[in-house]
Amino acid sequence: MLTCYRYIELNPVRAGMVEHAADYPWSSYRFNALGQDNVLVVPHDEYLKLADNAQERQLTYRALFNNHLSEKTLSDIRDATNKAWVLGSSHFKEKIEQQLNRRISPAIKGGDRKSAAYRERVRINGV
């Protein structure tokens, strides 16, 4: 979840609109990292778990921005967003897939369509 926070709050930086996430006026970064009031922001439980008090939470949150998001992470988030896939652990994806009763990640491609293993996978997964 916090990786997605970082992805969103760094979008204006990656786009060259600002030099730092705090410089973008519509970002939640100033609330999350600097403690500025914003009636539009409702802190997520994962954010609240960063520390027991607001000052330490903000310090910890700012520290998350010391490291860049990897190209793979950026690609994974973009793919999930653009293709309506679910992003998360295997357990989380399975849970969501069961609740929605539909595939929420890319289908397995290729394979020998005449093989018993392929036909069984199709029967089980509907792929």
Outline where the language-model segments fall.
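Short Pro-Cys-Gly-centered "Cys-loop" motif that presents a nucleophilic cysteine in a tight turn
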Residues: 1-127
